[in-house]
Amino acid sequence: VAASARTTSKLLGLAGLRVVFSAGAPVASETLRAISELAPGATLHTPYGMTEVLPVADIDLAAIELAERDDPNGGVCVGRPVVGAEVRIAEIDFDAEDVPPELATGSMGEILIRAPWVSDGYLGVWATERAARPGPVGDWHRSGDVGHLDAEGRLWVEGRAVHVIHTAAGPVTSVPVERAVERALGVARVAAVGVGPVGSQQLVIVVEDRDATDGPAGSDLAASVRQAISEPVASVLTVGRLPVDIRHNAKIDRAVVASWAGDVLAGRRVRNLSRWR
């Protein structure tokens, strides 16, 4: 709506908004500020949750800006849990049959949620239900998201558990790295993926540039990316268009990007990523 509001009548309509909610994927504060300019009378919220349990947490733009001053590289702050919801950060263990151990404040792990309004289960999908609701009671829901709780009790989302890059130096989450590069370069979309075996994966940064050729980035761009983040970067690549979920334009298909990046680094024939499926 905001992107298409080019006429005076549409802009006046947006000016009458009182509350705006944006959810479904990590929302950059820059995006919220742009919407705020079009709807100056609205309070902007980014509630966090999922189909199985919503809401889990909530935050408005003013609180996001305060959180980002405290930690500009923490990921996406989605606020404190709403009344009645409990959030736990647990070890990432895809094979756990019981609730994984809880981690200390500030530690990155999988986000687990308990609330009276969590859905009852999954109809006929027993393996999914066992994985999502571990333990004999099954009252904790494994979100599949990763993040951390800070000292103020705020929840930060850092990406998906399946997208964590397991390097020899430790795990690297996708969202904080991508946001740091996007801000430094002033670009709309970046993908951080891992190439190689789990435990010794190499971090590869793929920058979306409509004018670039799919393949290795130029030396200046690569240097700018490496200056933007503290993690060692094995390679910087560019693509004309990053592949996204057919239903959600904000959700990059990192599995496809990682496979393509592996081919590039292995010296195989570089194909157009947007047509790679």
Task: List each model region and its residues.
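Conserved ATP-binding/catalytic segment of the ANL
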Residues: 102-174, 183
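Gly/Ser/Thr-rich phosphate-binding loop
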Residues: 6-73, 86
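Active-site and channel-lining beta-strand-loop segments
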Residues: 86-96, 145, 241-247
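Adenylate-forming AMP-binding core of the ANL superfamily, especially NRPS adenylation
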Residues: 26, 47, 57-61, 65-126
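Conserved C-terminal "lid"/linker of ANL adenylate-forming enzymes
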Residues: 165, 189-194, 204-205, 222-277
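C-terminal boundary motif of the adenylate-forming
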Residues: 144-146, 180-210, 234-235
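Short, conserved charged micro-motifs
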Residues: 212-221
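Proline-centered flexible-loop/turn and helix-kink motifs
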Residues: 40, 83, 185-186
